[in-house]
């Protein structure tokens, strides 16, 4: 498997043996802390007995039934639970196997909404630069990453506006002013494209793999909502990373007044890493409008998969009953406080940011100037190697060829205790101290 991304059959990662809670063990017996919940998916931790029992029980009855032939009781129950957690206006769920598929299906549904409304000319989707929405060709075109260019030859180019930043701000602008510039870009672009042709605007309320837990000021989300309403554009929130409670609310949109989307997309934490599961959520009024015009008939072998939905129901039930959303908020605040303390003793931690248990640390050459380290140093790869040796599994990126900085995610499972947080921060501190010494030596 590793040969697909390394191009060689050399030494690969360690072989996994088992996992429980926030810990993973390899075949040699070495223990790791899952600092980023895999790729920010393992919300309730590994080896949860309730989830394993739900998996066994459902597998013993039926693993697969195609939705055209049978309705799965657990898909109905999961949809109802999601509607209750997501709140008014996101009443119905369409289940698929992964985030990229959910984004694709959500956009297809949005197109059906336009047709049901008698607006066949609406087809354009505006997204942000940077952003990350998946790994299919359509979702890559939304994501605006130059690394994807070789895969997109012949594909219609995406329509992008700038995403707002909180750390790497344009010269002379504060976060509020920069956010206002970005919302003005949205208005200008809708007008330039022709409002009657614009179908949707898609954004990540908290950036995941494109910007390391960056979010905008509250005013940004409210103004985006107002602009979309003004021009009849559907607002889609990609909550694949931030949703299912990770940000300290079920949807990150709930952190800000007036920010509610028309459509929302969930994955990762929805299945908790136990099964491939994703969904988009839609208002009953839009679902009924589409149904009245013939329905949303899109074939997908594993949509509303009975086993996946049974496991997803157990994951969300565990999340609710053990108050893991509230725990994400409280433990996440403690985590950021500890990371900021670490920042105070470091010359290379430029920024600590995030919401709930979705956080990032940006690494810089110099904290005062915010100067980035040279690409040749591969600072993220070096931190990951140091962390792995210490027993920490960390995800990080150098975004858009370094244009938006080097950062590592600190997003452990929502079940992490303060003792777990202390161990993570202590280990990370050692890694960054080692890196500081290496940088000082190299000049």
Give residue spans per PLM region.
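Conserved N-terminal phosphate-binding loop of PLP-dependent enzymes in the Aspartate aminotransferase
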Residues: 1-443
